Amino acid sequence: MAISYLTKTELDQFLHHNGNHIEASVRSALIDSLEHSGVYSDHPGDTSKAAFQSGPFGGAVPAGVQILDITQSTTVETTPNLKAIIFDDAGGKTLDVIGGHNDVFIAMGKGSDSVNLYDYGNDTVYGGSGNDAIRGGHGNSSLFGGAGNDSIYGGSGNDTLDGGSGNDYLEAGTGAQVLEGGSGNDILRDLSSGHSTLIGGDGNDTLIGVQGDVFAGGDGNDVFWVYGESGANSTLQGGNGNDTFHLQTHTGNDTIIGGAGSDTVDFADRSSFDVTKVDVDEKTNSYTLHFGDSQTVVVSGVEYLHFTDGDVHLPKL
């Protein structure tokens, strides 16, 4: 396909009127990325132009192309010049990105599409309003689902996963990653790294992680699951709502902050007789439970403890 050359204003008009109705915040992020990478200047009235290729794509990306507009499923190998890839709104496309340490910005359209990153760049992907699937690669990527019920998977780098609005599924990869569900009833899952941060946001969320992770439920009736026997320490914050914390581990020194609402901590395979000592700290409004196998759990703002032999109600301090 022929290459055209577009100023920032012409690119913005193209995104408005040529089947690429990318929301304003994503358009702004795209332009900022192109300015940061030196394609455009951030000075007012900048008339510099970017090399732009649009239409069906196949084969190697021409060396001079800086922005690629795709209209069908394809594989793209990144180059130092390629800075952005744009989807149209038709949906049903899969983009596979391969290559080295070249950073690329990907803006998906309104349809339900898939992006798979196999490269080593620190890429940025913005989903559209469809139900998108995004998979991270080997770099430190930023993956945003946007509206819709999205599925986002982290890669091997230190990625940021943001579901946006909708009922999303976020799964951490092997790096130290940040998972944020956004609004909606989301599922956040990390069973590999133990160095991730899981933030539910608004909605009734499910946060599944391992020892060493940090959990924050946000608003809504959230459910937390903590696995692993590494002995690493986790902090779990419920936020507003009636939250339930399931500790599926017998090691470590964990801290659970229930927040507003009626909250419950469930101790897997533990009876109340496994608790050998309880410390009460009225200054911090907390209870510290000591178990016979050296596990300790600090709880505050929690109303109930569930054991195999019954529930214990904790009075407010």
Predicted feature locations:
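GD-rich hexapeptide-repeat beta-solenoids
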Residues: 1-49, 54, 75-78, 83, ...
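Surface-exposed, low-complexity/disordered Ser/Thr/Gly/Pro/Asn-rich loops and linkers
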Residues: 57-59
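Glycine-centered beta-turn/loop sites at beta-strand termini
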Residues: 78, 87-89, 97-99, 107-108, ...
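Consensus positions within tandem repeat domains that build extended binding/scaffold surfaces
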Residues: 112, 122, 131, 140, ...
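Repeat-associated, polar segments at repeat-unit boundaries in modular proteins
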Residues: 302-305
